[in-house]
A protein has these predicted regions:
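Alpha-helical transmembrane segments used as membrane anchors
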Residues: 1-214
Length: 214
């Protein structure tokens, strides 16, 4: 009898993996994680926005300062999000994707709102869209403002846009890069709306010229 009782208790007690799955599916846990993502995206927005005004003064401190110096109370960092916010902004904007890093904030906020069940969205579409815009604008700004990288504290296309642009120029030349940017932008608009194809057909058919002749 005692053995049967122990077996029943073992069956009724959920295993560790099932407990983890249950916690992950819990609506309250989703809400808390979503709220954290939204708050973190607001924090990054503050850090990014402040970087445009305080980045020049903070750059030397971030580049030359050690972890201990940045962790100090009197670190002299002027970014409104503190030394960690200044580091994140400098890394994501200058070292990564430039000002298109704002699309990271957009996706984090949307993902947070979905987890909180504030808005019903197709998260995978937002992920694809934000990723494409992140990469495209990084390359565009890196290519268009390549000559300003040496004279500015902020790299509009980030190091990603700068390095990819240099490689593309070496392969297809400046006109080729503009063509690649144009065709990829058109493909993105087609991905967003099928009406783009209709508009392009009218454009290539020169329908507006035919109307003027009539």
């Amino acid at each position: 009898m005692a053995k049967k009782k122990l077996d029943k208790e073992a069956e009724s007690t959920p295993s560790s993996p099932s407990k983890i799955v249950a916690v992950c599916k819990n609506e309250t846990v989703h809400f808390v994680i979503g709220l954290m993502l939204v708050i973190f995206s607001v924090y990054l927005l503050l850090a990014f926005s402040s970087f445009f005004f305080t980045g020049a003064a903070d750059q030397s401190i971030i580049d030359s300062g050690s972890s201990a110096d940045l962790a100090a109370v009197n670190n002299q960092v002027k970014n409104y999000a503190g030394s960690r916010g200044a580091q994140l902004a400098s890394y994501l904007i200058n070292d990564c994707f430039g000002i298109s890093s704002f699309f990271i904030l957009v996706f984090l906020a949307v993902a947070g709102l979905k987890l909180m069940r504030v808005r019903v969205v197709r998260l995978w579409k937002w992920f694809i869209g934000c990723t494409l815009l992140l990469v495209w604008f990084s390359i565009f700004f890196g290519f268009a403002f390549m000559d300003h990288y040496q004279d500015s504290f902020i790299y509009l296309g980030g190091m990603h846009g700068y390095n990819v642009s240099r490689w593309l120029i070496s392969q297809v030349g400046v006109p080729g890069v503009w063509m690649i940017l144009l065709i990829t932008a058109i493909c993105f608009f087609i991905y967003i709306s099928a009406r783009t194809v209709i508009w392009l057909r009218k454009l290539f058919a020169l329908s507006f010229l035919k109307r003027e002749k009539k």
